[in-house]
């Protein structure tokens, strides 16, 4: 394997089995290069970060940098996507997809700071993440070389990885038994593999690790008031909070009531279908709040355009094109639409369901006077006939032509 002149590599490091093995592998296969470990704190389980620096150094890294990206992740990545209403294939709230560009960006920033020649990730050759990481690298620092061990090495099993570390006397807490593959951040937890590999198998209870089983959730519903400004959640139950703190608060409430579970089969960018169980408790509550205000504020054409924005944005984000001009254009349009998306929504949480039971906005286009079925001074029922005749004119002309040509 050629060194390609690489002297220093910054690795996106998680502390897991794969990236722990990547550190010595890089040093052995890239001419004894220096490996700097980069750990992104995006709200994953705190225990995943305990001792991660020591673990990286024991694996052979020269340095380990743990960077707190939690607030930036929610403020600059999650909230902008929420403004567009993006849902990949109608249900996936893009938890992993949104996290990859901020990780890769911070990794590139560290690489430039320490004078690295290359960046490295631990994504497999079958998944979407390799595309998301490398597209970001290319957009931000095209001169950096990219190393993707899963496309090069012959370590194809957990057993092989464990043996590799054992042979080099590198300690690890990993074991042979790893039933599921999981990704976790402040926004969501995804679970894949194991029993989920067959779409005919119902998820086991251990497929869900964050949210309470809706059937076992509290028997009494709970209400929460969400304040929205410019399409962003800014307060929970009247308390103004930062984006990350808003999400953190709603995650606790949502998980308690079994909110935010989905079990889907999705189309990966690389052409493979995959199944996953996703848990997004706080995010699901936020989406419900935003929809509640949008229903009051956006007119029909604006709402339709926001739906189209969300559809396009879902593919852009899923495909890892965060730093593409198209994403910025979609975002600018969404921000313009969100200017008047201000208001309050009271949501009821009950056994996995989120229901908007009260909503108000100073910019509301809803008028009780117009909405009534009774008589009023501003809407003349007789006007509807002319509108319908014009609205259906093309259908009328087509029908007349068909009769004429019979």
From Swiss-Prot:
GO terms for cellular component: cytoplasm. L-citrulline binds at residues 92, 97, 128, 132, 181, 190, 266, 278. Pfam families: Arginosuc_syn_C, Arginosuc_synth. It is found in: Cytoplasm. It is an enzyme of class 6 (ligase). GO terms for molecular function: argininosuccinate synthase activity; ATP binding. Signal peptide: none annotated. InterPro entries: Arginosuc_syn_C, Arginosuc_syn_N, Arginosuc_synth, Arginosuc_synth_CS, Arginosuc_synth_type_1_subfam, AS_cat/multimer_dom_body, Rossmann-like_a/b/a_fold. GO terms for biological process: argininosuccinate metabolic process; L-arginine biosynthetic process; urea cycle. Its EC number is 6.3.4.5. It catalyses: L-citrulline + L-aspartate + ATP = 2-(N(omega)-L-arginino)succinate + AMP + diphosphate + H(+). Pathway: Amino-acid biosynthesis; L-arginine biosynthesis; L-arginine from L-ornithine and carbamoyl phosphate: step 2/3. L-aspartate binds at residues 124, 128-129. Belongs to the argininosuccinate synthase family. Type 1 subfamily. Homotetramer. This is Argininosuccinate synthase. It comes from Serratia proteamaculans (strain 568). The lineage of its organism: Bacteria, Pseudomonadati, Pseudomonadota, Gammaproteobacteria, Enterobacterales.
């Amino acid at each position: 394997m050629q060194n390609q002149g690489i002297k220093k590599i910054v690795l996106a490091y998680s502390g897991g089995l794969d990236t722990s093995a990547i550190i010595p592998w890089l040093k052995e296969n890239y001419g004894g290069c220096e490996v700097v470990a980069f750990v992104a704190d995006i709200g994953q389980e705190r225990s995943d970060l305990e001792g991660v620096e020591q673990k990286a150094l024991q694996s052979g890294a020269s340095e380990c940098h743990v960077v707190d990206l939690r607030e930036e992740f929610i403020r600059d990545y999650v909230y902008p996507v929420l403004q567009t209403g993006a849902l990949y294939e109608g249900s996936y709230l893009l938890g992993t997809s949104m996290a990859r560009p901020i990780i890769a960006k911070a990794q590139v920033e560290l690489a430039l700071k320490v004078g690295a020649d290359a960046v490295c990730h631990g994504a497999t050759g079958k998944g979407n993440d390799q595309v998301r990481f490398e597209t970001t690298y290319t957009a931000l620092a095209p001169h950096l070389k990219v190393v993707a061990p899963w496309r090069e090495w012959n370590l194809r099993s957990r057993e092989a990885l464990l043996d590799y570390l054992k042979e080099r006397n590198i300690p690890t807490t990993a074991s042979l038994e790893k039933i599921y593959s999981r990704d976790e951040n402040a926004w969501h937890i995804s679970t894949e593999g194991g029993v989920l590999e067959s779409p005919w198998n119902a998820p086991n209870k251990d497929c869900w690790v964050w949210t309470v089983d809706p059937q076992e959730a509290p028997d009494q519903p709970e209400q929460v008031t969400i304040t929205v400004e410019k399409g962003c959640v800014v307060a929970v139950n009247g308390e103004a909070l930062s984006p990350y703190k808003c999400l953190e608060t709603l995650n606790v409430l949502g998980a308690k009531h079994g909110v935010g579970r989905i079990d889907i089969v999705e189309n990966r960018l690389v052409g493979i279908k995959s199944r996953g169980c996703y848990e997004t408790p706080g995010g699901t509550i936020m989406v419900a709040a935003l929809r509640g205000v949008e229903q009051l504020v956006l007119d029909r054409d604006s709402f339709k355009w926001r739906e189209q924005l969300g559809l396009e944005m879902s593919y852009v984000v899923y495909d890892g094109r965060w730093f593409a001009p198209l994403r910025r254009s979609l975002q600018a349009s969404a921000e313009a639409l969100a200017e008047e998306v201000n208001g309050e929504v009271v949501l009821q949480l009950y056994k996995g369901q989120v229901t908007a039971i009260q909503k108000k906005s100073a910019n509301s286009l809803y008028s009780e006077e117009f909405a009534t079925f009774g008589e009023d001074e501003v809407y003349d029922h007789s006007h509807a006939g002319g509108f319908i005749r014009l609205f259906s004119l093309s259908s009328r002309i087509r029908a007349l032509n068909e009769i004429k040509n019979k």
